[in-house]
C-alpha cells in the first residue's frame, strides 16, 4: 500500500530492533526450547511456547515500556504464566533467577540479524541516509544485541531507559530524529508492530511509519495491536526489509 504523504524529503531512518533488524522471535524460540526441556513436563513444542511468549496476553512487557513494571518483574510474570499454561512449577524468586540465567544465556546465543537487514543498511549508506535504533529495551542491552548480531554500524540512539518510558511515547521518536540531526518531518520509522511503531511514529510527527509485517510472524496472529484493514495516513506495510528503500523512494 503506498504512503499517502510525501516521503521525498526522508533523510533519516529510525529502526526498531527486535523482530525488525534482529530475528528475536528465533532467539526466543531457542531460549524457550532450552528452558522448556529443563523445566516443563513432557515433550516441548517450541513453536507453541514462542507463540505464547510473544503474544504476552496480559501485556506485561508493554507495561514495562510504560514505566509501570520493572524489567525483572515483567519477565518473571511471563515465565510463571508460561509455566502455568504448560504444566511447569510456580517459581519463587530463587527458582526464577536460575530459570532466567538459563533463558538469558540461550537467548543471547540466538541473536542474529535478519538476512535482509545488512542489504538495507548498505542501500541506506549508498543513498547517504542516516540511520539509528530506537527500542523499548535498555540502551546497553540493545547495543550488545546489535553488536552480537553483526550490526555494529547501527547507532543505538534511544531506549526505554532514556526517558523511563518507551514507544509509543512521542519523545522517543523525536529524540531519535534529533540525535541523527534530522527534523521529524524528514525521518521515517521502521518496525514490526503497527500500533507502537508505524502509527506511533506518524503520530509523533515523523514523515512516515513503515510496518514490517513478515508472513506468519504476527504476535498471536494479530497486527501488533492494531487493525490492519486501514493503516492510516503516513503508514506503509511491507513484508520484508528488502522493500523498505523502495517504499521510501530511495
Residue ranges and their predicted role:
Residues 7-115:
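N-terminal helical cap/lid subdomain that shapes the substrate entry/recognition surface
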Residues 1-13, 118, 122-125, 129-250:
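Asp-based, Mg2+/Mn2+-dependent phosphohydrolase catalytic module
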